[in-house]
Amino acid sequence: MGDWKVYISAVLRDQRIDDVAIVGHADNSCVWASRPGGLLAAISPQEVGVLTGPDRHTFLQAGLSVGGRRCCVIRDHLLAEGDGVLDARTKGLDARAVCVGRAPRALLVLMGRRGVHGGILNKTVHELIRGLRMQGA
C-alpha cells in the first residue's frame, strides 16, 4: 500500500467507523497512518507489544489499552490462523466497539461510532484485512 492517507480516507467513508489506524507490528511498532486528530493515532509501541505478545491470559483478565483508552476484550483470535481479529469495547460512559485485525506486517485498528455493534466492525475488519493480506501489508 503506497498511500496510506487514501486508504484511511476510504475506510472512514463508512459512516459506522469513527476512527482508524494502521500500526506496524513486525518491523516497526508504531502508527503508520491514522485519522488526523483521532484517538487511535496515540497507539504506543507498548500497546502493540501487548496486543501481539504471547501473554494472552493477562489482558483477557485485566483488559488492555488502545490509544491510552482502557478496553475490555470480548473475543481474542488475533493470533489465530485463519481469523486474526480481536474484538474489544472501550470502558466508560462513551463505550465504543474496537476491532483489531492482523495482516503480515501491520495491524488495522477500527473504532466504531457510538452505538455501532462490534459484529459490524468485525465483519468490516475481516474484509479489509483480506485486502491488506493480498497487498502483502
From Swiss-Prot:
Identify the keywords attached in UniProt to this record, alphabetized. Answer: Actin-binding, Cytoplasm, Cytoskeleton, Lipid-binding, Nucleus
Q: GO cellular component annotations, sorted alphabetically?
A: cytoplasm; cytoskeleton; nucleus
Q: Indicate the secretion signal residues.
A: none
Q: Does the keyword Cytoplasm apply?
A: yes
Per the record, the domain of life is: Eukaryota
> Sorted alphabetically, which SMART domains does this protein's record hold?
PROF
Q: Which GO terms describe its molecular function?
A: actin binding; lipid binding
Asked whether the keyword Nucleus is assigned, the reply is yes
Which InterPro entries does the record associate with it? Answer: PFN, PFN_euk, PFN_sf, Profilin1/2/3_vertebrate
What Pfam families does this protein map onto?
Profilin
So which tissues is this one expressed in? Testis specific.
Classify the main location: cytoplasm
Annotated GO biological process: actin cytoskeleton organization; positive regulation of actin filament bundle assembly; regulation of actin filament polymerization
Q: Can you say where in the cell this protein is located?
A: Cytoplasm, Cytoskeleton; Nucleus
Q: What does this protein do?
A: Binds to actin and affects the structure of the cytoskeleton. Slightly reduces actin polymerization. Binds to poly-L-proline, phosphatidylinositol 3-phosphate (PtdIns(3)P), phosphatidylinositol 4,5-bisphosphate (PtdIns(4,5)P2) and phosphatidylinositol 4-phosphate (PtdIns(4)P). May be involved in spermatogenesis.
Family stated for the protein in its record: Belongs to the profilin family.
Q: How does it assemble?
A: Interacts with ACTRT3.
Q: What is this protein called?
A: Profilin-3
Source species, please? Answer: Homo sapiens
